[in-house]
Design a protein with these regions (language model features):
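Metal-cofactor-binding active-site regions of metalloenzymes
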Residues: 1-190, 199-204, 211-212, 216, ...
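Conserved hydrophobic beta-strand within the GNAT/NAT acetyltransferase core sheet
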Residues: 192-194
Length: 312
């Protein structure tokens, strides 16, 4: 699908052409996944850019809390952020979008999962009906399993969300604390994902996959530190949804040209290229592909293999 055009666009460094070619974004936090210019036009002012590298999720959250969240508070702000995310995906040629909606957000609709789902359906149809939107529920790892289950249960009657993801502070609590939550999600046929191996070590990746029975991992880049963990991921066909610019800006890698995605790929692990938080890191998926090409991490042909990984 569009292999020749994609390769030519990379070789010619034609970002507009790249944006026209079908791709996926499987690691996207909805509130932070939007088109920055769209939000700026709505609020009537320019939002500061993150220009310096930071070293922790806490630093990122502080930056977001100061520079962005004040403009997207409440139901109206939430819906504008979702609009911006759909607009960003459409403009970037993303035809498959797995976008993370925090399980708590039904509280913006008086606790109604049904009303939240109605809003998401409406916004999807209005702003990006051509995008295959695969809704994902997000669990903050700092919240107790008991409370997450309480927030999660009302969604189960609607069969709308297709996957779940665990994100936030990797060290907030062990994966074993969340087994019941993930068993519940699995019993409903949801795809199981989690953020792991971004700040944590390689061993934590295998442990989390085994304990929570994960299908995919968000980040997982520290797997390169263990050949046995890489073998485990390859053997079990665990896909890693990687966000290169996010990894660089959060100081998880020193240079893009040495990003571990190369070694993971060479060890037979299925990887995809994604955005994480466009509002913060300012790169769409097209820019991420071009960055990896410019930094000679992959050839254009290899990047097309990775692009197609995400579309399958």
């Amino acid at each position: 699908m569009y292999t020749k055009q994609f390769i030519e666009a990379l070789e010619n460094r034609n970002i507009e052409k790249l944006r026209s070619i079908p791709k996926s974004d499987l690691h996207n936090h909805a509130i932070l996944g939007g088109n920055l210019k769209y939000i700026e036009e709505w609020i009537g002012k320019k939002i500061p850019r993150l220009t310096k590298r930071i070293t922790s999720i806490e630093e990122m959250e502080a930056w977001v809390g100061k520079n962005y969240i004040p403009y997207v508070k409440g139901t109206l702000g939430f819906e504008k952020a979702i609009e911006a995310a759909f607009i960003q995906a459409k403009a970037d040629g993303v035809i498959k979008l797995e976008m993370n909606i925090d399980v708590y957000f039904r509280h913006l609709y008086n606790g109604s999962a049904e009303e939240l789902i109605k809003a998401l359906k409406r916004l999807h149809q209005e702003y990006a009906p051509e995008v295959n939107f695969i809704p994902e529920l997000g669990f903050n790892r700092s919240v107790s399993q008991e409370l997450l289950i309480e927030w999660f249960e009302p969604y189960l009657d609607y069969n709308y969300f297709k996957s779940v993801d665990l994100y936030g502070d990797e060290f907030a609590q062990p994966a074993s604390n969340l087994k019941q939550l993930y068993r519940m999600a699995k019993s409903k046929g949801l795809k199981l994902k989690a953020h792991v191996g971004e700040f944590g070590d390689a061993e934590s990746i295998q442990e989390t996959v085994e304990v929570l029975e994960l299908d995919e991992i968000q980040h997982g880049i520290s797997a390169v530190k263990s050949k046995s963990v890489m073998n485990f991921l390859q053997r079990n066909n665990i896909q890693l949804n990687i966000c290169p610019t996010s990894n660089y800006m959060l100081s998880r890698v020193e240079e893009i040209k040495n990003h571990p995605i190369r070694e993971l790929f060479d060890n037979g692990i299925k990887v995809t290229v994604n955005t994480d938080d466009v509002i913060v890191f300012q790169n769409g998926v097209s820019e991420e592909f071009l960055l990896l090409y410019d930094q000679e991490v992959f050839s254009a042909e290899e990047l097309d293999v990775i692009r197609m990984n995400g579309l399958r």
